[in-house]
């Protein structure tokens, strides 16, 4: 039976949802820009003391902006372009190639019954999110 990309994406969504996996892309460039801009304006308005105050306020504002907004990994998976889904598909099928299944429901049941397979797929998914999407992964308990 040909393996469908959609089936594998559903499987990865199920596993990551079960573990409450979230990811956040940090916007460090935007935070640095805000920090510098506020420090610059503070320096123009208040001279050296204004620069110090502007730098402190800008730094706090920049830090707040870069504390990423977490999105559920299943949502991220489903929003990936087809080429990225294909990458995930290729990596996941290498892990589950020995399983025999007929549809996404059966595949999910087989994987959910194996802690070892779940760990391998979660590690692969966390690695993908961290390296390819440059995001921070978090698990809610």
Swiss-Prot record:
**What PANTHER family does the database record attribute to this sequence?**
NAZO FAMILY MEMBER (PTHR31493), PROTEIN C19ORF12 (PTHR31493:SF1)
Q: Which UniProt keywords apply?
A: Cytoplasm, Endoplasmic reticulum, Membrane, Mitochondrion, Transmembrane, Transmembrane helix
InterPro entries for this protein? C19orf12
Tagged with keyword Amino-acid biosynthesis? no
Q: Where in the cell is it found?
A: Mitochondrion; Mitochondrion membrane; Endoplasmic reticulum; Cytoplasm, Cytosol
Superkingdom of the organism of origin: Eukaryota
Q: Which family does it belong to?
A: Belongs to the C19orf12 family.
Q: What Gene Ontology terms describe where this protein resides (cellular component)? A: cytosol; endoplasmic reticulum; mitochondrial membrane; mitochondrion
Identify its membrane topology class.
Single-pass membrane protein
Q: What is this protein called?
A: Protein C19orf12 homolog
The transmembrane segments are 37-57
């Amino acid at each position: 039976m040909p393996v469908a990309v959609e089936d594998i994406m559903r499987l990865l969504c199920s596993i990551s949802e079960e573990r409450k996996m979230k990811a956040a892309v940090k916007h460090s460039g935007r935070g640095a820009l805000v920090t510098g801009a506020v420090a610059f304006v503070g320096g123009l308005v208040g001279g050296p003391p204004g620069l110090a105050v502007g730098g402190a306020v800008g730094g706090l504002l920049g830090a707040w902006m870069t504390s990423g907004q977490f999105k559920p990994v299943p949502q991220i998976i489903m929003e990936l372009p087809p080429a990225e889904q294909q990458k995930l598909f290729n990596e996941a099928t290498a892990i589950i190639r020995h399983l025999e299944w007929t549809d996404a429901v059966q595949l999910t049941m087989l994987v959910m019954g194996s802690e070892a397979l779940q760990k391998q797929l979660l590690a692969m998914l966390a690695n993908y999110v961290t390296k390819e999407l440059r995001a921070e992964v978090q698990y809610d308990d």
